[in-house]
Structure formats: C-alpha cells, structure tokens
C-alpha cells in the first residue's frame, strides 16, 4: 500500500502539466486588434490588482491562523494549514490569469473563425481552472498524505489542509462576490435604467469593473469554493477511516480523485471532438462522458482496494455522482423554462410582483434538492456507515475538473461578449458570443446548484468525521440528543449564523453599490461628451472603488466563520458545537438554494424579456424585471455562494479543534 501513496500527487502533477499545455494552446490564438487588446488588458489588470490586494490581506490572516494552529495542535497541522492556503490561492490565481487571457481570443475567434473555434477557446480557458482545482487538490492533499506515510495517527493532521483552503475560499468568495455585484448593480442601475444605454456599452464607467467582477467572482471565487468542497470531502473520508484504522479506506478518496482527474481530461477531449455541435450539446456530452468513465473505473478500483466491501462503497460513490447530476438538473429547471416565464409575466404589473414571484420560485426550489440530499445521506449511510457519506461526496466531486471547466467557461464567454460590444466588433460577432453566453448562463446556474449540493454533502461528511473523532478520543460513543439543552442551544446558534452572514454580505453589496452609483453618475455629469461617445470614462476609478469596498467588507464574515466554532466549542462544549454544526448545515443549505435559484430566475426573466418577449427592452415590464435582477444579483453571486463555504469553514474548524475539546 505504501508504494501507492505517491500515485495521487503524481497524477496531480500530470494534471497541472496538461493545464499548462492547454494554456499554451490558448495563447496561440489571435488576441485581436489593438482596441480589443486594450480592453482585455484593462480587464486582466483590474483582476490581477484585485487578487494581489486580496491575497495581501489573506496573508496576514492566514499567518496568524498558522501560528495559533502551531501553538495549539503542533507542527504537522500547521504545515497542513499552510499547504491548504497556498493550494487554494494558487487554484484561484491560475484560473483567473488564464480566463482573462482567453476572453479576447474568444471574441476575436467569434469574429474571424466562427462559433466552433470560439467555443473551443472559451472552454479551454475554463478547463485550465478546472484542471488546476483538481490537480492542486491532489498535489497538496496527496503530497501531505504521502509525507505522513498514511499512518492513521499522524494523518489526522491533514485536517488542517481543509482549514487553510476553507479560509482562502471564504475570503475569495465573499470578497469576489461583493466586488462583482457592486460593479454589476452600479453599472446596470445607472447605465441601463437612468442613462438608457445597453449592457457592456463602452460609455459606461462601470463596464470594465463589471467584466473584472465576472472573473473575480465566478472564476476565482467559484474555483476556491469547489476546491474547498473537493478537498473537504476527501479529508472527511480519510478522517472517518482513520478512526477505524483502515488504511485501504483512507487511501481510497485520493485514488478516486485521481481517476476522476483522468476522466475529466478525457471529458475535455470529448467536448473538443463535439465542438461542431451546439455548444450546450458539446458541453453535456463531455460532462456525461466523463462521469460514465469515472463510474466504470471506480467500480474496478473499489473492488481491487477493498475486496468484498468494495461493492457497497462503489454504490455509495454512484449515489453521490447521480445525486450531483440530479441537483444540477433541478436547478436548471427552476432557473429556466416555466418558472422564469412566470416571473417575466408578473413584471406586467410592476416590480413588486416580480419580487414576490421570484421569492416564491426560490423557496419552492429548496424542497426537491433537500430531498435528494436526504436520499443520498440515507442510502450511503445504509450501505457503508458514516464513511459512506464522505465517499458519496467524493463521488459527486471526483470529476470536478470537467465540472469546474464548464462552470468557468461561462465567465469567459460573458467577457468575450462584453469585449465584442465595447470594441464594436459587429452584430454577427455579438450573435455568436451571445449564444455562447446563453449556454454559459445555463451552465453557471447548474454549477451553482452542484456547488451547493457538493458543499452540503462535504460539510455533512466533515461533521460526521467530527462526531467520530470526538467519540474515538473519549473512548466510547458521542451522541447528540435533541433532548440535551446543550445541543439545542448550539442548534439555535448555528441556524442564526447563515442569516447574520447573509445580512452582512447583502449590506456590503448595497453600500459598495451606493459608492459605485455615485461615481458613475458623477462621471456622466462631469466628463463632457461621455454620454455622446466623444470622451472616455475613468474605468480605473470604478475598479478601485469596487476593490476597496470588497476588501474592507470581506473580513468580518471570515472572522465570524472561523471564530464561532472555537467560541461555542470551548465555551459550551462539544455537544453544543455538534448542535451548532447541525443547525448551521440546515440553515446554510436552505438559504444557499433559495438565494441562488431565486437570483438565477430573476436574471433569466430579464433576459427572456430582452429577447423580445412581452414587449422587449424599454418597456415597463422590462424595467420591473431589471429591478428583480438587480436584487437577485447579490442573492445568487454573493450571499448565496458564501453559504456553501460558511458551513464548510465551521465544520472543518470544528474537526481541527476536536482533539482539544
């Protein structure tokens, strides 16, 4: 078994090499005219400036965390925290860098070579992000597992990797979400409603910040989010297996992730081969093909590693993989088709009915995914105990390379459309980029649903590992009873935290958008000839406002998420902490689903009207839908996504400190 420990990090290094090769392929395509390059450079520079400033804040926070971890839990756990933070930061940075290089090339290919080449470039840009997430997880986590020699006692320090990755993910998701939505809301309200100019119009001072936001929120933020769930699922499975002293089950999550990476690379090749088909068909073919390949190889892997126990474990893996697909499809329904048409129709009677209908859709959309998650939990636990929950989460996330690639494709296509509009590349080019963007909106909605389901399952697996670790350290059972006041107190505290964090992040977007709106209004008023197209806006000022606002307001949610488990655990005991995690999980998952789906439905209702339905642009119905979309933006891209990471941060911090309770 020891000779197998080196395989996962080697697979991860191979995946990084493939990502590098794809990056060089992207660079070979034409970057466009000088005007296109200038716009792309502004987006790239704005994104990288934000990342540098964000990571400088993160460096201070993570350094303090590493020192505290070293003092409380020793060197090995501190090393793991450092590795997790570096890996998560690298995944976000590399994905952002490559996405901002692919956007102008996608727009240029749409103008000169057509939809097929444009799809390939946009997808390649997303693939780099996907492969970096999967590969860095294997290199970091697999490398630590190899370093600790697969020993159950020392391998528990790996839990620190999840804490480091989670902290980076939370700051990236919250900071990126505040940035992107303050820019988006400001640009939309002043540009579309007040000035009456189209989206991505070069006269709008907030348009570059809006395009930068697509990258910092939906590429770097989403990448860190998925990375943290991906690693969290593996860590939880390893931790549960460690309490059983079962080295085979400890190594299995890393082995499954390794074949998941290979399956993802094959899925990327399938998308390339199918690129002559419609974009949505090509992307679905790659996703399904990758999942089928993974499930088949996983069957033989589990049999060879676990013998007669392998079948039940494989069925748990299958349950997680199928559950992830189902949650994505349910999300697609609620953010498209009839629910969206109902919201758009309600706009005929004003913005109030748009808000009411959208909230109703969001609330209804929570029910079926929760039932799917409950089914996964019941089936996987029945098959192979608490370990089944962790391994089901691994099954859902193993093909993260292709899943994240398709999700990151969306912002690249969106940016390409923005560049085409700002550079005046013509109606035909815009039609191609719009068709790619439309598919990107669908994949983004599915990706958000998948991310919520994955985060929920990963968090539950980590909570299960927390319970097993406490029981193991106490030499007996650790049971959380609803009749125990300590557990109930913890549950009420836990369920209140998602509402507090949502309030903080929504308020942050509102405050930042207020600053952005005032700046855009000032420029329209004070720069002569700007609205007529005879002068250039000061886009850098808007980027700076969004950056400063995001960095100032991202710290408080992060501090609350990290400190709450320690305060409850050391103040009220392990029972209250277990209750807090249970309450927090239910609150976070419900809030995340409602906000993501309501926001996505509002967004697509606006786009449905903009296609010419119900009178099209410029009507009162359209204005009402824009209000819904504006409220939905921080729902689906700031507060909703922060719930995924919030519960995982609380769970992994609880698991790390469990030996001290």
Indicate residue ranges for each PLM-predicted region.
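Hydrophobic packing and interface segments
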Residues: 1-661
């Amino acid at each position: 078994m020891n000779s197998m420990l080196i395989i996962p990090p080697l697979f991860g290094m191979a995946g990084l090499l493939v990502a590098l090769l794809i990056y060089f392929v992207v660079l070979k395509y034409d970057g466009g005219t000088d005007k296109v390059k200038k716009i792309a450079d502004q987006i790239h520079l704005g994104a990288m400036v934000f990342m540098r400033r964000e990571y400088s804040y993160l460096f201070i926070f993570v350094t303090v965390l590493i020192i505290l971890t070293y003092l409380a839990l020793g060197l090995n756990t501190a090393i793991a925290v450092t590795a997790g933070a570096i890996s998560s930061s690298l995944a976000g940075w590399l994905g952002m860098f490559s996405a901002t290089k692919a956007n102008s090339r996608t727009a240029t290919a749409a103008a000169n070579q057509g939809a097929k080449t444009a799809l390939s470039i946009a997808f390649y840009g997303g693939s780099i992000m996907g492969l970096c997430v999967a590969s860095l997880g294997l290199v970091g986590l697999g490398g630590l597992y190899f370093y600790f020699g697969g020993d159950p006692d020392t391998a528990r320090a790996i839990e620190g990797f999840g804490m480091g990755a989670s902290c980076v993910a939370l700051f990236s998701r919250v900071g990126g979400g505040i940035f992107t939505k303050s820019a988006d809301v400001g640009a939309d309200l002043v540009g579309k409603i007040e000035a009456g100019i189209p989206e991505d119009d070069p006269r709008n001072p907030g348009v570059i910040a809006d395009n930068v936001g697509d990258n910092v929120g939906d590429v770097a933020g989403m990448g860190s989010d998925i990375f943290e769930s991906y690693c969290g699922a593996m860590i939880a499975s390893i931790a549960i297996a460690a309490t059983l002293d079962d080295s085979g089950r400890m190594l299995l999550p890393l082995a499954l992730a390794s074949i998941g990476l290979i399956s993802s690379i094959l899925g990327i090749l399938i998308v390339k081969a199918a690129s002559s088909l419609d974009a949505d068909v090509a992307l679905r073919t790659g996703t399904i093909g990758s999942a089928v390949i993974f499930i088949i190889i996983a069957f033989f892997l589990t049999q060879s590693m676990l013998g007669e126990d392998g079948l039940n474990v494989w069925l748990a893996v299958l349950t997680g993989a199928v559950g992830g697909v189902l949650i994505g499809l349910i999300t697609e329904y609620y953010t498209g088709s009839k629910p969206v048409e109902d919201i758009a129709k309600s706009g005929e009677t004003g913005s109030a009915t748009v808000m009411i209908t959208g909230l109703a859709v969001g609330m209804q959309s929570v029910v079926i995914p929760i039932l799917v998650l409950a089914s996964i939990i019941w089936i996987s636990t029945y098959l192979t105990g608490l370990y089944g929950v962790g391994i089901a989460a691994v099954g859902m996330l193993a093909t993260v390379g292709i899943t994240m690639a398709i999700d990151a494709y969306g912002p690249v296509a969106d940016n390409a459309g923005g560049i085409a509009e700002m550079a005046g590349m013509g109606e035909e080019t815009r039609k191609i980029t719009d068709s790619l963007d439309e598919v990107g909106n669908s994949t983004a909605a599915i990706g958000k649903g998948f991310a919520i389901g994955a985060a929920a399952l990963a968090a539950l697996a980590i909570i299960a590992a927390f319970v097993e670790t406490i029981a193991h350290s106490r030499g007996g059972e650790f049971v959380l009873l609803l009749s125990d006041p300590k557990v109930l107190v913890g549950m009420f505290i836990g369920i209140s935290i998602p509402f507090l964090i949502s309030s903080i992040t929504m308020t942050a977007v509102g405050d930042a958008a207020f600053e952005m709106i005032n700046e855009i209004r000032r420029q329209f008023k004070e720069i002569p000839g700007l609205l007529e197209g005879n002068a250039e806006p000061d886009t850098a000022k808007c980027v700076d406002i969004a950056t400063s606002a995001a960095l100032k307001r991202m710290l408080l949610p992060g501090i609350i998420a990290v400190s709450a488990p320690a305060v409850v655990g050391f103040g009220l005991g392990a029972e209250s902490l277990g209750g807090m995690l249970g309450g927090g999980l239910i609150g976070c998952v419900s809030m995340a689903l409602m906000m993501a789906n309501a926001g996505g439905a509002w967004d697509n209702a606006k786009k449905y009207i903009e296609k010419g339905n119900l009178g099209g642009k410029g009507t009162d119905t359209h204005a009402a839908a824009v209000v819904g979309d504006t409220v939905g933006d921080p729902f689906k891209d700031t507060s909703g996504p922060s719930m995924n990471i919030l519960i995982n941060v609380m769970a992994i911090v609880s698991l790390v400190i469990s030996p001290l309770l």
